């Protein structure tokens, strides 16, 4: 998780710096600097979105941004990344490549790199999310205040909690996507049996994510004795939107219902009275299906805390610039540790 450090570098706010949000599918990179509007406020000087799989390593992705958009020397970078830090490496099965921090720093000629979890970065941008509100899904229109929960299914399943406090509050990173998937229906039990025929561990991430949606679709085809016609999560969502593939429609329904269970459990765990934000373009693309689904029923269903959960607003918000904004806000607040002592980050992450 992100922690405060006293060795903040002098002069950081005056110098532009790189902020990158690296997920399993997309790499969002910006050139940022502190604005003069207030502490922690940031200004975006340039911004691009890259497809991670098009680059053999992260350094080449970042260099492509520098070559295209950076006209001045930049020596500092904050990296919001889905993954787990092991020594000087960031490792995640959802990333197309391992990230070795000293090699990355050397390849780009940087002085220092700081790292935090991608969903921690998104949570640090929640002030911006509250400003535009996102798209209301269920619950009251406005929150009562309190902890805010951020959840995002993408290449993986990320979650983080923003705790309000003096000075802007702080963020708790989680590995909630790795919690055991708990079926709530006979069909979900059948899917679980297909995903783990010999029993054993199936994390929520293997159901509530892009790859998870595809896995559910394939499982449903097997249950019905049909050969899968679709080979990508995007194809499943498109077919479900059109309503011309029964297994795709059911897969999205199960995905949405399971997301509701996951969100409700976390909202109870963290008493997220400040609201729940569901992040990512993936959810925005199926918003109408999500709105008609069993999400709300499962968010509330069968819980002694139903009265509490019914007072929590749930909104869908775009990922977009939020990750780089949140990473930059964190950076300006905490400063940069050296790459020899990188920030620990939680496993998982949406990897959008």
Segments (PLM) and residue ranges:
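Short beta-strand-loop/turn "lid" adjacent to the catalytic site in phosphate-handling enzymes
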Residues: 69-115, 123-133, 150, 284-288
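Short, acidic Gly/Pro/Ser/Thr-rich loop/turn segments
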Residues: 27, 84-86, 156-160, 215, ...
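Short amphipathic alpha-helical segments
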Residues: 31-32, 90-92, 127-128, 162-164, ...
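ATP-binding/phosphotransfer module of carbohydrate and carboxylate kinases, centering on a glycine-rich
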Residues: 1-73, 190-352
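Conserved phosphate-binding catalytic cores of ATP/NTP-utilizing and phosphoryl-transfer enzymes
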Residues: 2-12, 112-148
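Active-site nucleophile and cofactor-binding loops and adjacent substrate-binding regions
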Residues: 49-52, 94-95, 114-121, 140-143, ...
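Glycine-rich phosphate-binding loop of actin/hexokinase-like ATP-binding domains
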Residues: 133-204, 287-290, 295-300, 304-309
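Short beta-strand segments
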Residues: 21, 78-82, 116, 148-156, ...
């Amino acid at each position: 998780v992100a922690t405060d450090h006293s060795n903040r570098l002098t002069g950081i706010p005056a110098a532009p710096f790189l902020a990158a949000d690296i997920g399993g599918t997309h790499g969002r990179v910006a050139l940022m600097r502190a604005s003069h509007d207030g502490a922690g406020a940031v200004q975006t000087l340039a911004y691009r979105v890259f497809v991670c799989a098009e680059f053999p390593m992260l350094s080449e992705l970042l260099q492509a941004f520098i070559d295209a958009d950076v006209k001045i020397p930049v020596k500092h970078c904050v990296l919001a990344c889905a993954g787990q830090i092991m020594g000087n490496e960031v490792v995640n099965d959802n990333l197309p490549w391992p990230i070795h921090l000293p090699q990355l720093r050397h390849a780009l000629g940087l002085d220092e790199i700081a790292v935090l979890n991608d969903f921690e970065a998104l949570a640090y941008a929640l002030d911006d999310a509250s400003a535009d509100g996102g798209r209301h899904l269920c619950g009251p229109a406005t929150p009562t205040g309190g902890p805010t929960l951020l959840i995002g299914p993408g290449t993986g399943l990320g979650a983080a909690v923003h705790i309000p406090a003096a000075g802007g509050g702080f963020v708790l990173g989680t590995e909630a996507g790795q919690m055991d998937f708990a079926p709530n229906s006979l069909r979900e039990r059948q899917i679980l049996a297909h995903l783990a025929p010999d029993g054993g561990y199936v994390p929520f991430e293997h159901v509530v994510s892009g790859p998870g949606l595809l896995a559910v679709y394939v499982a449903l085809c097997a249950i019905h004795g049909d050969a899968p016609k679709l080979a990508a999560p995007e194809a499943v969502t498109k077919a479900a939107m059109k309503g011309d593939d029964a297994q795709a429609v059911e897969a999205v329904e199960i995905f949405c219902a399971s997301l509701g269970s996951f969100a409700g459990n976390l909202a109870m765990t963290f008493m997220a009275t400040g609201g729940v934000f569901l992040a990512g373009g993936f959810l925005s693309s199926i918003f109408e299906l999500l709105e008609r689904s069993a999400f709300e029923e499962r968010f509330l269903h069968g819980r002694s805390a139903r009265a509490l959960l019914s007072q929590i607003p749930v909104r869908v918000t775009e990922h977009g610039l939020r990750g780089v904004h949140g990473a930059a806000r964190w950076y300006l607040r905490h400063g940069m540790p050296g790459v020899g002592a990188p920030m620990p980050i939680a496993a998982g992450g949406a990897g959008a």
